[in-house]
Amino acid sequence: YMNYANKNFPNGVKSELGDIIAYHNDTTVDWLGFYGQGNYTSGALNAYGMLGTSSIKYSYQDHFTVANEKITSPSISAMQVKGGVMYDVNENISVFGNLGLVEKPPIMDNVIYFDGTVASDPANEKFQSMEFGMNYNTAKYAVKASYYNTQWMDRNLTKSVTTGQGSSGDTDVIFLTGVDQSHTGFELEGSAQVIDMLRLDFAASFGTWQFVDDASGNYQ
């Protein structure tokens, strides 16, 4: 295989079987997490809850660089709390509600970029979610209706731009912060057992998913 992409070698670089070409990177992901959950039932009431925490750390090493330096990110901690309750009004109708707060550590690409650039202050993505609804069930019919509201905050995004400025000379990495989204909507689903061998299912969803607030970016 002859590679003519490197301008420092106008006659090309010859690679044979077993040679390493294009890139030679090592990456690691160290993850540690704990969680606990519980459930409570009393008569028509059923409730559950869970609590969890985790910590993650990344490393990146590009063996094609002169320094061959191993780059390690700081440990990033996150937590999650979820809970819900369901109450049987009667044998056919039940109502329910769920709440949750979840932190999601950024993926490696949003902490250490492919060129070795490290984000200065990577933030956890955060999800605040609630859902309320009801179920209706009979021998032949089943209907579920629910309303949800999810706020997705500090979504992590990276953008590569060519500017002719910055330490790289022509290409810079922008770590975007404050990218927030709002997801709200109403969902309906159900089924009808017309005869023993025929069941009809239906589903509908109406939602508003949109970006909110202004985002900002940091050159690295």
For every predicted segment, state its role.
Residues 1, 41, 50-56, 86, ...:
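Outer-membrane beta-barrel pore domains and translocons
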Residues 1-90, 112, 216:
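Signature of Gram-negative outer-membrane beta-barrel scaffolds
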Residues 20-26, 37, 69-73, 85, ...:
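Outer-membrane beta-barrel proteins
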Residues 28-32, 41, 75-79, 126-130, ...:
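Residues that define the transmembrane beta-barrel architecture of outer-membrane proteins
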Residues 34-40, 83-87, 132-136, 188-192, ...:
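Residues on the lipid-exposed face of transmembrane beta-strands in outer-membrane beta-barrel proteins
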Residues 41-44, 149-151, 175-220:
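Gram-negative outer-membrane beta-barrel transporters
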Residues 44-47, 92-95, 140-143, 196-200:
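Repeated loop/turn-to-beta-strand initiation elements of outer-membrane beta-barrel proteins
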Residues 55-62, 73, 86-131, 142, ...:
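Surface-exposed extracellular loop regions of Gram-negative outer-membrane beta-barrel proteins
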